[in-house]
């Protein structure tokens, strides 16, 4: 148990699973077409540039994260480095982004469910399904972080099975002729493609909010970040290779993985990919609920929100008040359908969060010369 009253139940591989869950989200089922439409086969080069960029950001998070063991993640890093005002801004923006992200994915979930059961996309069935998602994940989170972590483990494996199947089978059906490079894209188009990829890979910072519930966070966080993001980059790159090599009209595809899989898995392909999308979205929703509900708790512990939000359930050792408040906000936004405007703030928020953590690194190094489990390139 931590000084905050929380229980450290997230193990090393639990954290890896949670990070993969939030990184390999619903975007992977549309990403190949979006990137291909922007830069054609140079999308593979964009992946390499993105991998290097995300890798540098992740290493900054790994080193900074190895210096903290309490709940808060980037919010806590900003508070320690820049003071309470900047931290409050980072914390609130992160919370709003996660709430909007959950609302968005809940809508995507019912859209994919509509592939199997069309009534799910509108009316009372839609409302019931979204409410059931929120209630179920709220109950799981209140019952204990151990339960949430185990759910994350199960859905990470379930999410990866169809994607690994897609790659493992699809690689045998690719046509080398489809990898011919056309005219080199302009800097603007290439930058846009890299931005799309970086945005899709983002989200890992949210899981670090739960540092107060991670076992040996100073050592586990760097390991989990490097393993999870490396695995995600390789998986995304291989999926792009299969899509390019098996789907002639990739740039114009609305459901690239489903259409590509049909060419080598037959009619079962789209069903497997759609089911995989449902599983993947649910897993991501679980991670978002786990992360966003801890931010108000962390801010309350630091005295920046009402103290009631810092209450911990006596039996389950979870921040139940913060969970209920966040879940209520998620439910209202998801049911209102107006979330689409709120989602636009996520890009700005992530730039602020990434920048604040990267800038915090050299400052924290100067203040504290203690050796850390991981160290990025640069002078102390």
Show the residue positions of the predicted features.
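Membrane-interface "cap" regions at the ends of multi-pass membrane proteins
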Residues: 1-33, 37-42, 46, 55, ...
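Helix-loop-helix junctions that connect adjacent transmembrane segments
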Residues: 2-6, 41-44, 120-128, 154-275
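Select subsegments of transmembrane alpha-helices in polytopic membrane proteins
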Residues: 14-19, 98-101, 316-325, 376-380
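Hydrophobic transmembrane alpha-helices that form the core helical bundles
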Residues: 33-38, 46, 55-134, 138-142, ...
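Juxtamembrane helix-boundary/capping and inter-helix hinge elements in multi-pass membrane proteins
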Residues: 38-41, 69-71, 80-86, 212-220, ...
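Generic alpha-helical transmembrane segments of integral inner-membrane proteins
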Residues: 48, 52-56, 92, 96, ...
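TM-loop-TM module centered on a large, flexible mid-protein loop between adjacent transmembrane helices
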Residues: 76-77, 83, 114-120, 194, ...
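C-terminal membrane-solvent junction of multi-pass transporters and transport-like membrane proteins
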Residues: 151, 184, 308-320, 354-380
